[in-house]
Structures are given as structure tokens and as C-alpha cells.
Amino acid sequence: MKFLLLLLLAPFISALRFDLKAESKPEQMCIRDFVSEGELVVINIDTDGSLNDGNVLNLYVHDSNGNEYRRLKNFVGEQRIAFTAPATTSFDVCFENTLDSNRGNRNAKRAIELDIESGSQARDWNKISATEKLRPIELELRKIEELTDEIVDELNYLKNREERLRNTNESTNERVRNFSVLVIIVLTSLGAWQVNYLKNYFKSKHII
């Protein structure tokens, strides 16, 4: 339910704004999002500041499969990044702000505005409206239709994923059950062998 609610609210969520302090040994700050196979992803970035202001801001965009979509070194201002996801996966937008000790001070930082759009949100609806000569109400209905299709596809993906996990769980349970039966058989056989061995040993010593 929460996932569905986020999908419905996604078109109304404003861009993410934050400050990233410059450090001599910076750690990457990453924002993670998820995308389905074949979906268009558009990332818009805007920063304040200027080159040589003591901040060396770097950007890395990559997914969990190891694909890298963009790498920017010492950038400032507006940047637009677009790519089509080769598979259903998560991707990270990572920032790294290094302090230039020769030009900056310990309070150096960059204000960053980040907006990530995917699927129907990432499409150029103005161009589509002009090309297909859609009226405003038709354009809104088209947006709703595509968003609904995306929600249905996402729900189907979650359903299929749940089925795969259930099958894996059932297979694991079956292997554990078979292993438990095998252990019981081995322990029973070992116990019987020990009893027989002790019986023969005591007989040989004329104890019994």
C-alpha cells in the first residue's frame, strides 16, 4: 500500500534540496531510486557556486549491476542526465565534494537541487502534445493512462517476485526436511552400530 501511495504521489513531489559540505577526505552521499527494465530515467541537477570556489564537486550515476551512466568531475550549475534502464534494478546518484585547501575554507559547501524522473514522468509531454495535437484534457488523460499502466506493471512485477521467493522458500524447506531425515537415519544407524559393537565387546571380555 505504501509503495502504491508513493507512485501516486510521485508527480507532486518537489525536487530534493540539500547542502553538501566540502571535506579533505569526503565520503560519497548517494540517493537511491528504483527503475523497471526499459524505463527512461531523467536526472536534473542544479548547484550554486562557481568553479575555483574551494569546492570540487563530483558526480557518479551507476546501478546495482555495475553499469555506469555518467561521471562528472568538478562540475557546477545545471546538468541533465538521461538513460534507459537495461534491467529492473536500483540505481544511485552519488555526490562527492572535495575541499580545495588552496582556495576554500573549512565552511565551504555546495547547495544541490536534485530531481529524478522515470517512466511517464520523464517523457517530454510538451513535445508529445505538439506532435499529436492533444488538447489539455486529452494530455492529462494520456498521462494518467501511462501512469496507471506503470502501476499495473509494478504490481505484476511484485507479484511475480513474491511467487519466485515463495518457490525458493518451499525448495529450501524441502532440502532442509530431506537433510533432517538423512541426519536421523545416519544417527540411528550409528547408534545401532555402537550398541552392537559394545555388545560384542562385552561378550568377548565375558562380561555378559
UniProtKB/Swiss-Prot annotation:
Transmembrane segments: 178-198
Pfam families in the cross-refs: EMP24_GP25L
Domain of life: Eukaryota
One GO CC annotation: endoplasmic reticulum membrane
All residue ranges annotated as the GOLD domain in the record: 28-118
Record keyword Endoplasmic reticulum present: yes
InterPro entries the UniProt entry points to: Emp24-like, GOLD_dom
PANTHER family: TRANSMEMBRANE EMP24 DOMAIN-CONTAINING PROTEIN
Similarity-based family: Belongs to the EMP24/GP25L family.
Protein name as annotated: Endoplasmic reticulum vesicle protein 25
Gene name per UniProt: ERV25
